[in-house]
Structures are given as structure tokens and as C-alpha cells.
């Protein structure tokens, strides 16, 4: 009797998510390819090399990345600054996302690996954000960052550049970092860059 009731309740709980999934399936349209295959490919190559037990994903948003990492066996925590960056609220149906500001994190755990995929460019206090992530690493831990990059010049918001093809009416900035920012991120820490990959997805000088 208890088992039957439990199964019935589970079916009721699944009605909403199933309806949303079916609706998304029916309404999907191809728009363009993006950089995620490159970024996720790098993340999962590093997972296979590092084999981290505890992983923190910073700035998850609505993505499925923490669920995919969890499927690899890792213990995963996902965070996002929901209050400030998602004024209308945000719900991730793939994974539980904690509300936490990485520039002033309240998390006390330490992690073997931290991922921050296409997020740091949208955080104005990027120095505090990177330092916050470094502080959450275990000794010998790894931080994976992906972001727009221009070796010689920092750009505060590539969406504002003349001829920009993206980012119109978006309520947040998209920074392109230079070597200066990278070096400053590492100042006063025991961290070092162990691997970098560069990809050009736009035909201009900047990410736009």
C-alpha cells in the first residue's frame, strides 16, 4: 500500500517537469553554434586527467553542466548569484543551485576542482571573484576558467564596441581580459597557470 502510494505521488510530481521537457522539445529551433562544445570538451578532458572527488561549479545558471559532472561520479556543488544576476528568479531543472556570491562567498567547503565556464566575464568584481574561487580550492586543487581573451588589451564590455554583433539589450557586461588581468589574478597566491587553450570564434579582434 505504501509503495503504491509512493509511486502514485512520484507520477504526480513528474507531470510538471515532463510537460516542460516536452514543450521545450517541440519548440526548439536551431539558431547558431556556440562555444560550449569547446569549453565543455576542455572541462571533461581535465576531469579524466584529474579525477577530482569534490567539484564546485560557479555561475551555473540554467545549464546542465553540474549534472553532467555528477554523472561522472564527482560530488558536485553548484552556485550562482541568483539574487543579483537573475532579478526575475532562476530555476535550474537539471541540478540544485545554491544562491551564493563568489565575490563574497559563504561556502566553507574546499574543492579539488572548480569550474567557471563563460561566467567571469560578466562579473565586474572579477578580481574578488577569482580570489574567492582560489580560496575555496584544496591544496593542489585546480581552477578551470573560460572567458573572452585579448592578450594585449582589456575591454570592459565588448557588447559596446562599434560593430558588435551580439549583446544588444543584455543587462550585464561582457569583459575581454588581457595578460595583465591574468597576472593580477595570480598575485599573492600559490597558484600558477598549467594549461591554456586559445580559440577564435569571431573574425574580428574581440569577442563580439
Please state what every model-predicted region is.
Residues 1-8, 41, 45, 208:
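Non-catalytic N-terminal targeting/anchoring module and adjacent flexible stem/linker
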Residues 28-29, 50-51, 57, 166-168:
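A short, structure-level motif marking secondary-structure boundaries and short turns
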Residues 41-155:
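Conserved SAM-binding loop
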Residues 30, 89, 103, 115, ...:
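S-adenosyl-L-methionine-dependent methyltransferase catalytic module, highlighting the catalytic core
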Residues 36, 40, 62, 175-182:
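A structural signal for well-ordered alpha-helical scaffolds and beta->alpha junctions
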Residues 1-24:
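N-terminal, positively charged/glycine-rich alpha-helical extensions of SAM-dependent methyltransferases
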Residues 20-46:
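Class I SAM-dependent methyltransferase Rossmann-like catalytic core
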Amino acid at each position: 500500500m505504501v509503495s503504491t502510494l509512493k509511486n502514485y505521488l512520484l507520477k504526480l510530481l513528474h507531470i510538471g517537469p515532463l510537460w516542460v521537457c516536452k514543450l521545450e522539445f517541440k519548440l526548439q529551433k536551431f539558431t547558431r553554434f556556440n562555444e560550449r562544445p569547446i569549453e565543455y570538451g576542455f572541462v571533461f578532458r581535465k576531469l579524466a586527467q584529474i579525477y577530482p572527488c569534490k567539484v564546485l561549479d560557479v555561475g551555473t545558471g540554467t545549464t546542465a553542466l553540474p549534472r553532467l559532472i555528477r554523472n561522472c561520479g564527482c560530488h558536485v556543488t553548484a552556485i550562482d548569484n541568483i539574487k543579483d544576476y537573475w532579478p526575475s528568479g532562476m530555476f535550474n531543472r537539471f541540478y540544485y543551485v545554491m544562491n551564493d556570491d563568489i565575490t563574497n562567498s559563504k561556502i566553507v567547503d574546499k574543492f579539488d576542482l572548480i569550474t567557471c565556464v563563460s561566467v567571469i566575464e560578466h562579473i565586474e568584481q572579477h578580481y574578488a571573484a577569482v580570489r574567492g574561487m582560489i580560496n575555496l580550492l584544496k591544496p593542489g586543487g585546480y581552477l578551470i576558467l573560460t572567458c573572452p581573451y585579448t592578450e594585449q588589451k582589456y575591454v570592459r564590455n565588448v557588447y559596446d564596441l562599434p560593430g558588435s554583433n551580439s549583446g544588444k539589450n543584455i543587462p550585464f557586461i561582457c569583459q575581454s581580459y588581457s595578460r595583465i588581468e591574468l597576472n593580477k589574478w595570480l598575485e599573492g597566491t600559490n597558484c600558477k597557470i598549467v594549461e591554456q587553450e586559445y580559440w577564435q570564434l569571431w573574425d574580428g579582434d574581440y569577442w563580439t
